[in-house]
């Protein structure tokens, strides 16, 4: 617990130094590797510490949660959708492929045999298709976010 507290203070100090206007965290907390939950919990703990200390920069900061490759936010819960061009989607795929943990299929959520990057692209394209079907602008893909508001 002492080590965790030291890490939280270090993370809090980094946030205080940067004073970000936006923080992006994984909202897919059922990640098979467990890393998404660990990272998200670390960010939330640092934000909570900053809040306890009365950090003024927090009122100008939004925390956005994205989903992993297995599921998307329900359309009625999406609070920000960012269009992704074909070139950006390729860059996202290449970024995913640079992570060894994403190179193989993960035994998670059923019998989906697609690789992580394939599920990710299909999810982003599916979100764009849904927005198009609702009569909104048409894009290659979209990344959807839900805002996390610390209590």
Q: Residues of each region from the PLM?
A:
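Short, solvent-exposed loop/turn segments at secondary-structure junctions
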Residues: 28-32, 69-72, 89, 101
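Short, flexible loop segments at boundaries between secondary-structure elements
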Residues: 49-78
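Single conserved hydrophobic/aromatic residue that forms the stacking wall/gate
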Residues: 1-9
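Proline-aspartate-enriched helix->loop->beta-strand connector
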Residues: 10-31, 36-39
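Glycosyltransferases and closely related glycan-assembly transferases
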Residues: 38-52
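C-terminal regulatory/interaction regions
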Residues: 48, 94, 103-151
């Amino acid at each position: 617990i002492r080590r965790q507290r030291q890490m939280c203070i270090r993370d809090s100090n980094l946030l205080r130094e940067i004073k970000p206007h936006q923080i992006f965290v994984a909202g897919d907390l059922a990640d098979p590797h467990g890393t998404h939950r660990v990272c998200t919990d670390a960010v939330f703990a640092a934000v909570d510490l900053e809040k306890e200390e009365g950090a003024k920069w927090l009122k100008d900061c939004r925390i956005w949660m994205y989903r992993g490759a297995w599921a998307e936010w329900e359309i009625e819960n999406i609070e920000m959708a960012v269009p992704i061009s074909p070139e950006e989607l390729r860059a996202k795929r290449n970024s995913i492929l640079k992570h060894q943990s994403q190179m193989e299929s993960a035994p998670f959520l059923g019998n989906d045999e697609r690789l992580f990057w394939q599920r990710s692209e299909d999810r982003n394209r599916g979100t764009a298709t849904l927005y198009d079907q609702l009569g909104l602008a048409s894009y290659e893909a979209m990344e959807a976010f839900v805002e996390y508001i610390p209590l």
